[in-house]
Amino acid sequence: MSFDFIKDKNKHIHFIGIGGISMSGLAEILLYNNFSISGSDMNSSPITEKLKDKGAKIYIGHKKENVKNADLIVYTAAIASDNPEIIEAKEKNIKLMDRADFLGNLMKGYKYNIAISGTHGKTTTTSMLSHVALKANVDPTILVGGNLDIINGNVRVGESDFFITEACEYKSSFLKFFPYIGVILNIDADHLDYYKDLDDIKNAFSKFIKLIPKDGYLVAYGEDKNIQSIIKEANCNVITYGINSGDIQAHNIEYDEKACGNFDVVKDNQKLFSVKLNVPGKHNILNSLASICIGLASDMKDKDIIEGIESFFGTHRRFELKGCKNNITVIDDYAHHPTEISATLDAAKKYPHNKMFCVFQPHTYSRTLTLFDDFTKCFDNADEIILADIYAAREKDTGIINSNMLGDKLRERGLKCTNFHKFDDIKNYLIENAKDGDLILTVGAGDIYKVGEMYINL
């Protein structure tokens, strides 16, 4: 690990938006290496409290006074240019670096950077691969976009040359990285508040491919038509995977009673080994194939790959079992794109239940608007849909789109759908309507998980 880009280990580094999952991980890596760290966020959280316990100075709220001792300021893509700390930094000529630039510079200190990209499945695949790498004793540094029990959080600092991280395409952040193994899980239309269209997104992934050195590897889902159209851009070793085609394939797939897949891993029509997943759905078979390809490319032993995959029971907010109440199961999932919702509901359909309630909170106005037609078609596997208001995240409500409009379209299609403005009202509706043996599935990237927790903690 090298921090040459920071120049001086005595420098004080301030993070604007330190409570974010990636920013907090970067701060924790620096704290581990004895840097002086501060950060600000709009709200206190378990993440900010954990950083405080590790020695960071935490400010709640953004104020210009927060950056007075900073030598370098790191900020996220969600921070606006009129943020008082950004303004103060520019006035005082304090060096500014966005999160992606900072992470990219950090990656320069490692030889084997594994950057996992794709519209869907990044956190799960990064987490699954982390299990494999730890079983293989490669002592990796890990930065993941969710909480992973095996590392007791979202970051692990190792002493080897292996660095495993997610590579998000939003605002082309992943083009600032230095992958030795670059992974593309899938390509879909998303982040259309930044990209013009799907072709623009594919162009960004094409540029990502070109970042991989000649002796490095591209690991890609070969059955994704959007990936197929750009894979020829690779000037490195290429490993593809899939169910029916690819260098590495999953054959003889069977699902257990909880929709978890068992399958043979096949290369050149020869069985390498078999694995049994402990996470549900076809999409996780594909995620595991990506992890297996990376393990094979990194010369990890078959037994370590198998043990790593089979020891993975998921991450927080990815088809996470929250608990049971009166024999009613509550599961939470981070899905917020129509493709992800379809995959989650497909997995949930195989899960034992009588009636499935899907409680969905749309995430951002721009995504809800640009993918509106797809959102009207992705809930068919739910017996009943409950819609919360749109979670704004970084956006402002312009009045163009709302959850009631989505609810109206779902009802027009003959689906049972109810809209609510308040979480308390959703909870009360579930109390009245969910019966013995039913499944409540909370879905969305915002704070809809709170509904399930409210229900369980009655």
Swiss-Prot record:
Binding positions (ATP): G118, T119, H120, G121, K122, T123, T124
Localization of this protein: Cytoplasm
EC numbers: 6.3.2.8
Pfam families, A to Z: Mur_ligase, Mur_ligase_C, Mur_ligase_M
BP GO terms, sorted: cell division; cell wall organization; peptidoglycan biosynthetic process; regulation of cell shape
First-listed, main subcellular location of the protein, grouped into a coarse class: cytoplasm
Role played: Cell wall formation.
PANTHER family tied to this protein: UDP-N-ACETYLMURAMATE--L-ALANINE LIGASE, UDP-N-ACETYLMURAMATE--L-ALANINE LIGASE-RELATED
Protein name from the UniProt record: UDP-N-acetylmuramate--L-alanine ligase
Organism: Clostridium botulinum (strain Okra / Type B1)
UniProt gene name: murC
